[in-house]
C-alpha cells in the first residue's frame, strides 16, 4: 500500500525536530541533493546587497531645503565649503543642491548634522 502525500506530511508533523533533521540528512544522502542550497540562496543574495550598501564609503551631501532659517543655513554652508557670501547664498537658494560630493562617511555625517542644526533639510546619497 502506497502512502499519500497527506499521510507522509502527517507522519512528519508528529516527528520531533531531531528526527526531522535526521530524515532530511538521510534524504540528502539518498537522493544526492541539498535542502539548504535553495533556502540559503535568497538570504545570501539579500545579505550581499545589504553588505554592498553598508560598504559605501563616499557620500554626496545634498541640501534638500533651507527651511525657515535661510541666513543660518547660508552661514553653515559658507563655513563648510569656504564659499563667499554670494556663492553660498546662490547655492542655498538653488536647493536641492549638492554641498559636498565624495565625502567620507564621518565627514558627511558631521556636515549633515551642522546643516540640520542650522535649520536645513539634508540628504546623504
From Swiss-Prot:
GO MF, one annotated term: structural constituent of ribosome
UniProt keyword list: Ribonucleoprotein, Ribosomal protein
Pfam families registered for this protein in UniProt: Ribosomal_L12, Ribosomal_L12_N
GO cellular component: cytosolic large ribosomal subunit
Keyword field contains Ribosomal protein: yes
GO BP, sorted A to Z: translation
Record InterPro entries: Ribosomal_bL12, Ribosomal_bL12_C, Ribosomal_bL12_C/ClpS-like, Ribosomal_bL12_oligo, Ribosomal_bL12_oligo_N_sf
Source organism, top-level taxon: Bacteria
Subunit structure, as described in the record: Homodimer. Part of the ribosomal stalk of the 50S ribosomal subunit. Forms a multimeric L10(L12)X complex, where L10 forms an elongated spine to which 2 to 4 L12 dimers bind in a sequential fashion. Binds GTP-bound translation factors.
UniProt family annotation: Belongs to the bacterial ribosomal protein bL12 family.
Designated name of the protein: Large ribosomal subunit protein bL12
Amino acid at each position: 500500500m502506497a502512502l499519500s502525500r497527506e499521510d507522509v506530511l502527517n507522519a512528519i508533523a508528529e516527528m520531533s525536530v531531531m528526527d526531522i533533521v535526521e530524515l532530511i540528512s538521510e534524504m540528502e544522502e539518498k537522493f544526492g541533493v541539498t535542502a539548504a542550497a535553495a533556502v540559503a540562496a535568497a538570504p545570501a543574495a539579500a545579505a550581499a546587497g545589504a553588505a554592498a550598501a553598508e560598504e559605501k564609503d563616499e557620500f554626496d551631501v545634498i541640501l534638500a531645503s533651507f527651511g525657515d532659517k535661510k541666513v543660518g543655513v547660508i552661514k553653515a554652508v559658507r563655513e563648510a565649503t569656504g564659499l563667499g557670501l554670494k556663492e553660498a547664498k546662490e547655492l542655498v537658494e538653488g536647493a536641492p543642491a549638492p554641498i559636498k560630493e565624495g565625502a567620507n562617511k564621518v565627514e558627511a555625517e558631521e556636515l549633515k548634522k551642522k546643516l540640520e542644526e542650522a535649520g536645513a533639510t539634508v540628504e546623504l546619497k
